[in-house]
Amino acid sequence: MKNQWKTSDFDYNLPVELIAQRPLADRSGSRLLYIDRSRRTVSHRQFNGFVEQVKPNDLVVLNDTKVIPARLFGHKQTGGKVECLVERILSKDRFLAHIRASKAPKLGSQIIIADNFKIIIEGRYNDLFECVLHSSASILDLLYQHGRIPLPPYIQREPDKDDQARYQTIFAERAGAVAAPTAGLHFNEETFDALRKKGAAITYVTLHVGAGTFQPVRADSLADHRMHHEWMEVSKAVCDAIAKCRKNNGRVIAVGTTVMRCLETATKNGECRPYAGETDLFIYPGFQFNCVDALLTNFHLPKSTLLMLVCAFGGYELVMEAYQKAVENRYRFFSYGDAMLIS
């Protein structure tokens, strides 16, 4: 194992045409690349192969965050155009946002959205602005009336009605994410029925995915990278389900990198404890896993923290080999793309 990992170690060549621009007609119609760590093998399957790998007493953990229509368009009092991406809702009328304009807004200045919603800039923290909505309505009211789904930057088109349903898991409950927990997008009701018939348990954590998930790693050395913060919650019910799973010799299966980060944040010395708050956990090769036994995930961007996490769990050489095979076999990549299972 290397002592000094470089961001460039996680680069790979991806033809642009393999980046999925739209979802498949069937949520569960994706392909599945399966990595067996013990045998060091990589095999090609369909997504229903995920359920085939689940055993009785396994615990499948998903992220129930809900994507909000977080992208707003408005103008300054001077008339200049403004684009606002809500990063985190702090209260009914207060939120943090990324703001794009010809000139950065000054503290105390106003942004007008659709004439009847007024936003005041009250603070700035690095790239984020603290904003207050001056209205009897809530920030969620504003977003659901005038916001747009914030599709990832590698999807080169405007969002449409199809995205409102498909860039959202069918089990999304808690509003607050600006990006979908994409491993969960493959699940339909038939998937859940099949898991229950296998004798698996199902539970949910929450991590509100922020725009930081798309930010590039700017440091050359991973040791110098500072991870973005995201809000998460692991409840006592989840901890109890994990304890029961362990007692029955089952495996904890994380559906997505967000679930992985939740569970590993909440687990210390092999014990998962309830936790609600911030996480900036950065998982890369050399990390000691304490909770998760198997990971279902999508394919991730070159040099991204998500790919680094997957390499930490699956083994660097094996995962990078699998990515090369995925490219050669023309898998669909990123949010609307195919899946990978590592066990």
Swiss-Prot record:
UniProt keyword list: Cytoplasm, Queuosine biosynthesis, S-adenosyl-L-methionine, Transferase
Record InterPro entries: QueA, QueA_dom1, QueA_dom2, QueA_sf
Subunit structure of this chain's protein: Monomer.
Pathway per the UniProt entry: tRNA modification; tRNA-queuosine biosynthesis
Gene responsible for this protein: queA
Catalysed reactions listed for this entry: 7-aminomethyl-7-carbaguanosine(34) in tRNA + S-adenosyl-L-methionine = epoxyqueuosine(34) in tRNA + adenine + L-methionine + 2 H(+)
Keyword match S-adenosyl-L-methionine: yes
Organism: Coxiella burnetii (strain RSA 493 / Nine Mile phase I)
GO biological processes: queuosine biosynthetic process; tRNA wobble guanine modification
Name recorded for this polypeptide: S-adenosylmethionine:tRNA ribosyltransferase-isomerase
GO terms for MF: S-adenosylmethionine:tRNA ribosyltransferase-isomerase activity
Taxonomic classification: Bacteria, Pseudomonadati, Pseudomonadota, Gammaproteobacteria, Legionellales
